[in-house]
Amino acid sequence: MNRLTNISKIRKSLIDGKLKVNDLVLNKIKEINKVSPNHLNTFISLQDEKSLGKQIKESQERYDNGTNKRLDGIPIGVKDNFSSKNFKTTCGSKILENYIPSFDSTVVKLLKEEGAIIIGKTNMDEFSMGSSSTSGHFGKVINPWSKPNNNNNNDNDNNNNGEVLYVAGGSSGGSAAAVASNYCVASIGSDTGGSIRQPSSYCGVVGFKPSYGLISRFGLVAYASSLDTPGVLTNNVEDAAELLDILIKKDQENDSTSIEFINNNQNQNQNNGEKRNILDEFNEKLKNKNIKDLVFGIPKDYLVKELDTDILNLWKEVVEEIEKRGGKVVSVSLPHTRYALPAYYLLATSEASSNLSRFDGVRYGYRFEEEKDENKVDNDNDDDDDVDENKIGMGLKDMYTKTRTNGFGEEVKKRIILGTMALSRSSYDNFYTKAQKIRRLVSDDFKNVFQGENKVDILITPTAPSPAFKQNEKMDPIEVYVNDIMTIPSNLAGLPACSIPLKLSNSNLPISVQLISNRLTDDNLLFAAHTIMNFDCYKDFTSLTPNYLK
């Protein structure tokens, strides 16, 4: 099955008996290990053979009996910050290297209930803190569009045989690279400031972040709880719609969904407040709507100096293609976009400093253990019950300090320190409170565009200011943070956003545009994304094979 084959076509082949679940799943495993085990380092861990065999057998039996579920036998990758029962969940960190949860996250549970086969847990930046998937404890993810050498030896970022390795983006880089490489049909990621959309752009796949609160966060290891959003990475928009339809459920057992998908569109011939099925809404729009029915906004504030020429040209080209087909395009202003990046890093790190305080070596995860000196003689002649409480206190403090110092990577420690500073008494008003005010202003900017005079339906922007950069490229930390400048605003406002790959840059790397819509108009966003991806000039992109797989 190639990248062009969507879930519905795979399911039909399985129902018709033209394809067996065993062949589908084991071919994916074979591809992952084709050159050497996990060659692109997309997965941290794969499902064990016994569990995999059991799931394959059960799925095939349901197909044979005509009782198959929607995702039966479909291999799905899951980012390694979603808890999965009896399956390591590491968050890409040494501190959780051997942590095995006793429960499934709601996202994993919903996938399993529909018969999906969780083929493995995908690699990521540690605790989702990064934009390149190079900061994790389990090594760097290689972008499948990298240029391989003749010997397929990836010991160095760039070697004498002409190999050039590019980052996969982050923090869901493993998920994006796995889908682009056809190692799984689709993958699950999390998006806090662009962590689904930016790697999707770098790897040339569809990345969809839904409205905040639609998909349950229960079992998603928190980075910044008010921003973290589960989402999907696929090769086409149809698969994104199908997965979202399964995952968008009010979580009755936990409080990590805040809203239900209701009719939020005044123009629809339905009663406001009526619950909707996102897949049905998407399919209905495909039948009865076209590009002429939408108003597209072009935010001039996204025209930043860091914008790559190829991406700028693609942005202009998409606008021209929409206008050629009768779509209405207007220029809009989001004036507080310039403040979104610093506000985000203050808010996200503040929440992270609190969320990550639980990793202390006491309750679960890695604990620092000092090496015992076998030759050390205990000269303490005091009675055993004569305990020095000060020594115990210092020992516990040392254990906390050394556990977190050795268990967390440099980027995570940097962000914890920044967040702790922002929440301190002397800095709270000057930093954290101001960042919250900026968040409100950014949200109001979007509200004015979507509900203002032009009634914009969809905003079109670049996804990232540049294509993927080289793995060994020396970059100032601020330059790295700027890679999220296009994606962060929609997280601050809780809006749905989608990255769609459309063509290759002059350096043969995927480039994309981002679409953003109003809250709870996720179905409209899916329709717009599908329509643009199927313009004649773009529809062949997903048939291209990434360089590293040729």
From Swiss-Prot:
Keyword Lipoprotein: no
EC numbers on record: 6.3.5.7
Function: Allows the formation of correctly charged Gln-tRNA(Gln) through the transamidation of misacylated Glu-tRNA(Gln) in the mitochondria. The reaction takes place in the presence of glutamine and ATP through an activated gamma-phospho-Glu-tRNA(Gln).
GO CC aspect terms: glutamyl-tRNA(Gln) amidotransferase complex; mitochondrion
Residues of the active site: K79, S171, S195
Keywords per UniProt: ATP-binding, Ligase, Mitochondrion, Nucleotide-binding, Protein biosynthesis
Gene3D superfamilies, per database record: Amidase signature (AS) domain
Main EC class the enzyme belongs to: ligase
Source superkingdom: Eukaryota
Residues covered by region (Disordered): 371-390
InterPro entries: Amidase, Amidase_CS, Amidase_dom, AS_sf, GatA
Gene: gatA
Gene Ontology BP, a term: mitochondrial translation
GO molecular function per UniProt: ATP binding; glutaminyl-tRNA synthase (glutamine-hydrolyzing) activity
Catalyzed chemical reaction(s): L-glutamyl-tRNA(Gln) + L-glutamine + ATP + H2O = L-glutaminyl-tRNA(Gln) + L-glutamate + ADP + phosphate + H(+)
Main location as per UniProt: mitochondrion
Family: Belongs to the amidase family. GatA subfamily.
Subcellular location: Mitochondrion
Protein name: Glutamyl-tRNA(Gln) amidotransferase subunit A, mitochondrial
Assembly, per entry: Subunit of the heterotrimeric GatCAB amidotransferase (AdT) complex, composed of A, B and C subunits.
Organism of provenance: Dictyostelium discoideum (Social amoeba)
